[in-house]
Amino acid sequence: MIAHSQDMSIVYHKINQLSSKAETILIYQSFIYGNRLTHPANLFIIKMNLIEINKIIILMKEGSFMEWTTEKRYLPYNKWDAETLLDLQAQADQSQSQLHYHIRPSSGLLNDPNGFSYFNGAWHVFYQQYPFGPVHGLKSWHHMKSADLVHWEDMGLAVKPDTQFDSHGAYSGSATVINDKLFLMYTGNVRDQDWVRHSYQNGAWMDQTGHIEKLARPLIEAPDHVTEHFRDPQILKHGDKYYAILGAQDKETKTGKIAIFSASDLTGKWTDLGYVNFTDKDMGYMIECPNLVFVDDQPVLIFCPQGLDKKITPYENIYPNMYVAGSKFKFDAGKMTTTQAAPINLDDGFDVYATQAFNAPDGKAYAISWVGLPDVEYPTDNENWANCLSQVKELSLKNGRLIQRPVAAMGTLRQAGHLIRTEKVIDGRQVVESHAGQQYELKITIARNQSGTLHLAGNHTVDQSLQLNFNTGKDAFFEIDRSKAGQTFNEKFGVTRKIRLPENQDLDLDIFIDHSLAEVFVNNGEHVMTLRYFADQKNDKIALTGKNSLNYYGTFWNLADM
């Protein structure tokens, strides 16, 4: 193979000469995934010889057509041409791993949900987006709108990095309704000439037409007792005051904190109230995305501690998403009363972070998460898009622990459904669905005192599958193993996730599959396990295996696009 830079230059030049970028995207997928895209594939074969094909495949697999320098990541949006963005959108749309009933990026990278709210008769959520590639670059808020928390309308980019107080990114934040407008509060990321970060907590108004007008000056600047890591404001109203809680790193101790501020006038002076007192344990070196939500009238703090000692709460992901439930929250004192000894994992799967929750006008608590993690690469990075949001979950409390369940409107996605029941063992397998497809919901109850494996996304023999291992007898457990579910990734942090179950009890699972995403609700939402996996799309068998025939029953539905 010739020198990398020369090779890339020759191949890329030929691509530009011989086919459009959109055709190149389809050609790439044709060869990598085996699609029968006759026209572009034939076009490619006619115009390029096999050696050049191999070069392009290698370079695209390596992601070498774009070198993501700092300068490139923070290039102003107006420096990118419209054709590039359209090509990236086409590439994302054509991906075999693309989501069909979850919010996913129109192009590039998606991360934290922002501004989750109910305003002007509709639900709103924004997400952090870098539109030009699968990397963390110059971020905006991308706006989505829904009538039912399930079917989402794409409203486009909303909060863009276009002022001196958000020049290097409109970072995460929240929203609250004030009279006939939605008030947005977000972190403006600014880098100076020495690349030192400055964080500003900014405000903006969104009217009923969706027009956004930013405030001229920041609401809050970083106090002296925090480092440059000071972000992700959640704005709340309590009594006649406004409050904001933020993720922070204490300057002296370099530990993670939740800062709290108050104001009588939303756009006036904000008072530093110090840190929220909710634990006597060290929460690592940084806390991100703090959220205070009231669930069944009880305060619950949801947050992402980075660098948390695993002796405090065990976790396996690079960074966890956790919560602490309490009985009281004193706003002016910044104190939560709780008997919870340590934070609890919000999700027991592989890929949940930056969950944002809020209380709807009727008091119900809803949450939505980024399905992805910081500092983790996903296979779709090679297709220039990354990540998605979870489905919305309704929150409740049971014995001091959060219960998370799908919202009722998820049922509107259900298409033809049918009952499933115990089948005979044939060739060592009990086949639940021979061809389930890639968009479905499976509600299944597995009887007590059994052990075995539920295979999803399985090939004919289910030796390749997403494996859900269980024991419903003594020492009961439930485990997800994605090591044989197609393309492996992020193995550094393990390929299995396991939870303990009550002994000698039936196991109830509500499983949602959306091509490359699985959301598993265990025992009516007592646990949720969320994960990405990248199996061959032809593998869609559902089956059970065990030493003996397994007893089960349930319902299977195909699901529509949102």
Each predicted region: which residue ranges?
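Short hydrophobic targeting helices and cationic amphipathic motifs
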Residues: 13, 17, 29, 40-43, ...
